[in-house]
């Protein structure tokens, strides 16, 4: 089984702008540009606000327990349904979790995590 990773990095504004400038030059020159997939934050504080211990626990629980609904996830974690729903919506916007609605009698939204590891990269 192949391990799937997601990259999370801290990239300072200057480095981000320099990389964007370099990419634009390559595009203008007609060169092929490889797509870099990942989640980037400007600083460690921003990353900590996004990936709180509760949200990391939520990702782990989704991956390990594979709940069939948001309600089931909230019960597994002994957390309030509203808070779990808000955290899932936030993590979905960051592309860290996927929510797929089912077409059963009762509409369910099973969350899923499609990677095995989060790799953190911090430039010095």
Where do the model's predicted regions map?
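Glycine-centered, phosphate/nucleic-acid-interacting loop/turn motifs that mediate DNA/RNA or nucleotide
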Residues: 95
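Short alpha-helical segments that sit at the start of domains
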Residues: 30-57
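A short acidic, leucine-rich amphipathic alpha-helix
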Residues: 72-76, 91
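General nucleic-acid-binding
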Residues: 1-28
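Short amphipathic alpha-helical elements of helix-turn-helix/winged-helix folds
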Residues: 60-65
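Short, cationic-aromatic polyanion-contact patches
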Residues: 47-54, 69, 101-124
């Amino acid at each position: 089984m192949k391990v799937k990773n997601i990259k999370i990095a801290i990239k300072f504004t200057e480095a981000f702008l320099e990389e964007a400038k370099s990419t634009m030059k390559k595009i203008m020159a007609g060169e092929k540009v490889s797509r870099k997939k990942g989640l980037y934050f400007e600083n460690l504080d921003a990353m900590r606000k996004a990936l709180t211990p509760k949200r990391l626990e939520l990702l782990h629980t989704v991956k390990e327990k594979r709940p069939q609904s948001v309600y089931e996830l909230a019960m597994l974690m002994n957390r309030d349904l509203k808070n779990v729903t808000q955290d899932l919506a936030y993590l979905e916007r960051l592309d860290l979790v996927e929510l797929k609605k089912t077409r059963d009698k009762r509409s369910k939204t099973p969350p899923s995590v499609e990677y095995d590891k989060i790799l953190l990269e911090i430039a010095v």
